[in-house]
């Protein structure tokens, strides 16, 4: 039964979506979940919103609504791989959440290496001269956009 809910590789993901598919990117934190969406041509990822993680059913309902309202065809989830390439407890937690998402939402889902995504999102907002308070407030959705952008850039090649 568990195999049905396995995540697929980015290359398998690429084969399951069309070139004109909007995708959603998720940065699963311990308290918040950053959400980003890309355009149908998979050119640019845009920060969308931050969801709270305290109630999984509420999160799932919000995720389903976002997916339906935005015609999303695939999910990219940041995979918190350690800097040395190993998988720690955070990676297992993300996989557990992904399995639960897949039990409830029937579109392709794959994990994408999220190393340094939060740092990258923070640095990008620094380059754009965004106030620190706003950077921190939006860091989760910006990290999700950073993750999603990396994945869609890979998918284009």
Positions of predicted regions on the chain:
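Phosphate- and other anionic-substrate recognition elements at nucleic-acid/protein interfaces
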Residues: 6-24, 31-157
């Amino acid at each position: 039964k568990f195999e049905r809910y396995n995540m697929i590789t980015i290359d398998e993901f690429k084969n399951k979506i069309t070139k004109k598919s909007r995708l959603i990117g998720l940065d699963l934190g311990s308290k918040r979940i950053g959400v980003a969406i890309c355009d149908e041509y998979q050119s640019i990822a845009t920060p969308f919103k931050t969801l709270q993680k305290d109630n999984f059913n509420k999160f799932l309902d919000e995720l389903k609504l976002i997916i339906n309202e935005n015609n999303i065809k695939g999910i990219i989830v940041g995979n918190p791989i350690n800097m040395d390439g190993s998988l720690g407890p955070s990676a297992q937690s993300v996989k557990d959440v992904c399995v639960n998402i897949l039990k409830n939402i029937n579109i392709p889902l794959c994990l994408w290496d999220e190393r340094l995504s939060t740092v990258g999102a923070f640095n990008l907002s620094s380059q754009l001269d965004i106030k620190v308070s706003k950077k921190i407030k939006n860091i989760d959705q910006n990290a999700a956009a950073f993750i999603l952008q990396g994945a869609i850039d890979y998918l284009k090649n």
